[in-house]
Structure formats: C-alpha cells, structure tokens
C-alpha cells in the first residue's frame, strides 16, 4: 500500500504548495517592484 500512502501525501502537499505560492505572489504584489530579499 505504498502507492496509496504516496498518493495521500501528494494530495496533502498540493494545497499547501499552492497556498504557499499564492501567499508569496500576493506579498510580492503588495510590495510592488521591491525585490530585495
């Protein structure tokens, strides 16, 4: 049942990854063109 476990992990990571990318893009958008990390 390794495939089922990996499938569950992937399904759990996808929303987290999308949320992280959305938050990062939103923060960069609010900061404007300031790209000093």
Swiss-Prot record:
Membrane topology term: Single-pass membrane protein
GO cellular component: chloroplast thylakoid membrane; cytochrome b6f complex
InterPro entries in UniProt: Cyt_6/f_cplx_su5, Cyt_6/f_cplx_su5_sf
Subcellular location per the Swiss-Prot or TrEMBL entry: Plastid, Chloroplast thylakoid membrane
Gene Ontology molecular function: electron transporter, transferring electrons within cytochrome b6/f complex of photosystem II activity
Keyword field: Chloroplast, Electron transport, Membrane, Photosynthesis, Plastid, Thylakoid, Transmembrane, Transmembrane helix, Transport
UniProt entry tagged with the keyword Secreted: no
Transmembrane spans: 5-25
Listed NCBIfam families: PRK00665.1
Primary role: Component of the cytochrome b6-f complex, which mediates electron transfer between photosystem II (PSII) and photosystem I (PSI), cyclic electron flow around PSI, and state transitions. PetG is required for either the stability or assembly of the cytochrome b6-f complex.
UniProt name for this protein: Cytochrome b6-f complex subunit 5
Source organism of the structure: Arabis hirsuta (Hairy rock-cress)
């Amino acid at each position: 049942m390794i495939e089922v476990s990996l499938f569950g992990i992937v399904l759990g990571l996808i929303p987290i990854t999308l949320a992280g990318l959305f938050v990062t893009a939103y923060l960069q958008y609010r900061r404007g063109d300031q790209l000093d990390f």
